[in-house]
Amino acid sequence: MITAPVAATPAKAASPSTLYQRICLGYSVSAVSISLDEAVDLARTGDVWLFRGHAMADRAIQLATNSPVNHVGMSVAIEDLPPLMWHAELGRALPDVWTGTRHRGVQLHDLREAVIVWAARYGQRAWLRQLDPVVTGEMEDAALATIARLDGTPFPSTARLASRWLAGRAPTRTRQGGGADLETAYCAQLLAVTYQAMGLLPGSRRPGRYDPGSFWSGDNLGLSAGFRLGGEIAVHLPAGGARMPHTPAAPG
């Protein structure tokens, strides 16, 4: 169980609405920092999670995709279900909520547990970007349909990841949107395909053109239908971390 760190002078926690107002006002990353508990309370479908690590595998992905971050995922918060994380990774530390099994590649995880694994076990810094306005029921249905179609898709090798990123930037006369099934999927491509299905990104752009850094505020993502992502919110775990799953896994 995650507990808030003990402070010498307890301060009243900001409500989710107050936190969101601060984010929309454009506070910098250093000015907005919240606990994992607060981040989970804020979770809405379509919110983006960004991770940056310093291990060799993390740096390889950053170099291969020319990105300042090495992993990206999306919050899924549907009705009475606990908040979930939709992403693609090499690890299999957590059971996939959709299938009930542990596997590599495209996965749907408990949001809190996924952030704990990435921040505490893999040594990653975590940031949250909230999507505004709230998505519609039809957009949530499109996200769930994408989850049903792509959950379990394998994660590509680092070499294939780099080649796909380069291919995504090559000019083409053929429209390649997010409708086609994927043989493999890395995290940013998965998020792009899901956003395209939800109508948040144009379907005319290749999903392979996106890398984790495309979803960082320093890039011009250009969402559709008047949607926007707020600034990065640094998310911190409580002092002492949390108990990790026992299954060995490697980040991706």
Predicted features along the sequence, with ranges:
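Cysteine-nucleophile amide-bond enzymes
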Residues: 1-252
